[in-house]
């Protein structure tokens, strides 16, 4: 539901809460949340991460814009659960307390301007994914996206950049067919 329709605007004007599906599910569910957004690649990344996590843990839920509503699984979640959630800009508009342990913004390119009206507003809404994250949380950002590279310099959660085209001083990058994690102290091959 667009947040600028008269009914929703009147709720905001009256100080009434306006929760979307993601906010309701987050408040109802348990466990840690890994949330993925971006203009392109969300579904593929969410499915891949969901598979990796499902192979490593017992209680994993892959939900959100990927097709399974977050709310449909929220009551099944336990403290030990991991939720991998694909989150769209539309879903981010109505978050209030939603706070993923790890967030990722894959990229931001011009899209949904019929809803967000300007590129600046679209970027602002995408960046809401870190709104409630703390310094104990992580945000994974695409180093090749100039908007995200700059955004990462000014956010509360720990920033981890990734790149498929260059070696990074710190972050995750491709080196030939090798995925490498480089920290200040070491270089760790992750997948070959």
State each model region's role.
Residues 77-161, 165-168, 172-175, 180-181, ...:
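Flexible active-site lid/hinge loop adjacent to a nucleotide/diphosphate
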């Amino acid at each position: 539901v667009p947040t600028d329709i008269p009914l929703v605007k009147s709720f905001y004007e009256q100080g009434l809460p306006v929760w979307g599906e993601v906010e309701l599910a987050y408040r109802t569910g348990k466990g840690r949340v890994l949330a993925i957004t971006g203009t392109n690649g969300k579904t593929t990344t969410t499915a891949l991460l969901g598979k990796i996590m499902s192979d490593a843990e017992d209680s994993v839920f892959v939900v959100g814009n990927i097709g399974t509503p977050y709310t449909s699984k929220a009551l099944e979640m336990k403290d030990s659960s991991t939720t991998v959630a694909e989150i769209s800009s539309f879903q981010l508009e109505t978050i209030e307390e939603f706070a993923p342990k790890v967030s990722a913004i894959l990229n931001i390119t011009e899209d949904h301007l019929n809803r967000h009206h300007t590129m600046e507003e679209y970027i602002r809404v995408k960046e809401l994914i870190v709104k409630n994250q703390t310094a104990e949380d992580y945000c994974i950002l695409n180093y090749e996206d100039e908007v995200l590279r700059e955004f990462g310099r000014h956010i509360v959660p720990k920033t981890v950049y990734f790149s498929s085209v260059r070696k990074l001083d710190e972050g995750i990058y491709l080196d030939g067919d090798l995925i490498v994690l480089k920290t200040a102290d070491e270089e760790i091959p992750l997948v070959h």
